[in-house]
């Protein structure tokens, strides 16, 4: 029986799939941290005492004390949260 090109390609694809699965399972089972975590660079999220709701016009009620509204999907009730930490959002304005 002759070893043809189609059989060779099928074996090559099979070996590539097995190799890829082996690499994926090895990295997925890793318990180590990919980067050192520092409390200096962390962000702390806290729930505020108030909730926020969507008004009939589609606008949300304001959160106070440095908090902002977070809601899920099409929910009309959300929670006010506050972020505290070392974070820097990119700005579209030119910095001087």
UniProtKB/Swiss-Prot annotation:
Residues bearing glycans: 51, 74
One Gene Ontology term, aspect cellular component: extracellular region
Residues forming coiled coils: none
Domain of life the protein comes from: Eukaryota
Record flagged with keyword Disulfide bond: yes
Compartments reported by the entry: Secreted
Signal peptide residue numbers: 1-28
Cystine connections: 48-67, 52-69, 63-80
Any one GO molecular-function label of the UniProt entry: C-X-C chemokine binding
Keywords for the protein's UniProt record, in alphabetical order: Disulfide bond, Glycoprotein, Secreted, Signal
Function: Salivary chemokine-binding protein which binds to host chemokines CXCL1, CXCL2, CXCL3, CXCL5, CXCL6, CXCL11 and CXCL13.
Protein name, UniProt field: Evasin P1078
Organism listed in the record: Ixodes ricinus (Common tick)
């Amino acid at each position: 029986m002759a070893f043809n090109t189609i059989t060779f390609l099928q074996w090559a694809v099979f070996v590539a799939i097995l190799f890829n699965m082996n690499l994926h399972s090895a990295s997925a089972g890793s318990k180590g941290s990919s980067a050192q975590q520092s409390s200096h660079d962390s962000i702390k999220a806290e729930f505020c005492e108030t909730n926020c709701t969507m008004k009939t016009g589609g606008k949300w009620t304001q959160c106070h004390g440095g908090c902002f509204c977070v809601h899920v999907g099409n929910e009309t009730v959300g929670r006010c949260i506050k972020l505290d930490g070392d974070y820097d959002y990119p700005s579209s304005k030119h910095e001087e």
